[in-house]
Every structure is written in structure tokens, then in C-alpha cells.
């Protein structure tokens, strides 16, 4: 695991934190992971890949919700039904204990999908 990320599964904390390729700290809570699995149980074996999607995947900003980004990454192991994982991240700020505005970026959902390769 890369030094700039935390995998807290072994520590009993209900959150995974990674940094995207732009240096943004983003977290996925156990509650959100369970939300994803409620409607997409086939993703249960792909937590590491979902985190990798955020770390190294491409992203697109939502045109109507400018603080929402969709991260995409291709994974051959999802074939034949799907070939990409998608993670939706909300970028916000919150006040820390000193009253300073700090980033509060988090995953709200994710899914697998087939994206036709461009020719």
C-alpha cells in the first residue's frame, strides 16, 4: 500500500482513506460501502479495485453538480459483463476543531459498467 493512504480495515475503523492522482484526500465509509453492496452485491470482492479507481482512475466533473466527480478505471477481471468500476465522489469542506475550513471529500456510491472502447 502507498504511504499516502490509509487502509483501516485491520484497525476496526469504518473508513478507508486514499489520495487521488491530484492529491485530494477522499474517504469511503463502511456505511457507504454497505450501501453499494446492497444493490450491487457482485462488487463485494472489489473493494481494493474501487479504492484503486479513486487513486489512479480518470475523473469527470458532473455538469449539473460541480462538486461531484465520477472516477472511472478499467479492470479486465470484471469481464465479460463489465470492464470499468465507477466511484462517485462529492467534494466539500468542513470546519475543523480550530474553525478552519478543511477538505471533506467522500464516496457516495459506486458501480461496475461496460464502457465501449473508443476506436
Question: What is each model feature region?
Answer:
Residues 1-119:
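Ribonuclease/tRNase effector modules and their secretory precursors
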